[in-house]
């Protein structure tokens, strides 16, 4: 598989504050081979994001990557990030035939802890930091979005091989505005989402450990 993690960071050129933020997140992390990709402009932010991701995946196919990391410019590493553990989990999820490996989510419907630090998820939101594997490239490229669709919800419709690291290694930094999801513009809203999902996964992890110890 890849030696360094091929990383594509999405940034609207006018959002210089986000560009500076995301460069600071990655500049001292040598395990990532990152490039900043200019986001496709569209009057509907979610459509522009999807089109940008399509362009990235087409590029990844041309470069014959086994997987890539797609990252939005509001991604922020948490203190839980560990280079060797992240790389190990990328390989572990690949052995499970994962389509996506998420660094952190703002919502999920169902979850099952398969191993310490790795959950299978059903229905999620949060594409600020995710590994997408080669097996899913063409499937992603065949996605079509309507004006009222959202890319993460659309992915949920076509994949049941979505996994997430826990504890989260990625959350979304609040900038006071969103180019994709207007409901996330309220102060503290995004932080609350991630706090809630973290607590839910912590409970599921605790219960799994508890019942295993009863055996």
Could you describe each region identified by the protein language model?
Residues 1-71, 75-215:
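An acidic/histidine-cluster motif and surrounding catalytic segment
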